[in-house]
């Protein structure tokens, strides 16, 4: 309700309103659409269900399938744009990249009127980070973006600000 109210207040000032929110019901997404939200982002984090459950041992985020199907519910509710992505580095990056591509392709095929985008964030080393990661190098990220562009030529690709400016500047031409 809070997000819908914020969108209603913002709608007169912006031509498009996007949200990156927790998994909701289709009715809740429809309430957001009715309030003026037209773009939705949901990071699955990883498509490896066993790993996902290990990373989320309790709480509302634990329901893997509910989260996995959130973009579908958002599209059914009327979102004009849906953005999905996995956090590269939680699992083997090629596996999550593959399933992210399949997920985006399925949404695109099921909802041809919805614009699809894929985000490509990578785990980056930082103080306090856990050690059980599967690093994806800059070279791996380039390979992923090229594969996405070949497989889903009309799909938007979002780069993370986690990437070095030098890297972002060079990746723009690929996506």
Identify the function of each model-found stretch.
Residues 166-175:
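C-terminal hydrophobic structural anchor segments
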Residues 33, 75, 105, 172-173:
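Non-catalytic positions within long, well-ordered alpha-helices that form the structural scaffold/packing
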Residues 1-74, 80-83, 112-119:
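Core AdoMet radical
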Residues 38-39, 44, 65-129, 138-163:
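Conserved C-terminal portion of the radical SAM core fold
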Residues 134-135:
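Local sequence-structure signature of Cys/Sec-based thiol-disulfide redox active-site neighborhoods
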Residues 23-26, 124-125, 164-167:
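Short, internal active-site loops enriched in acidic
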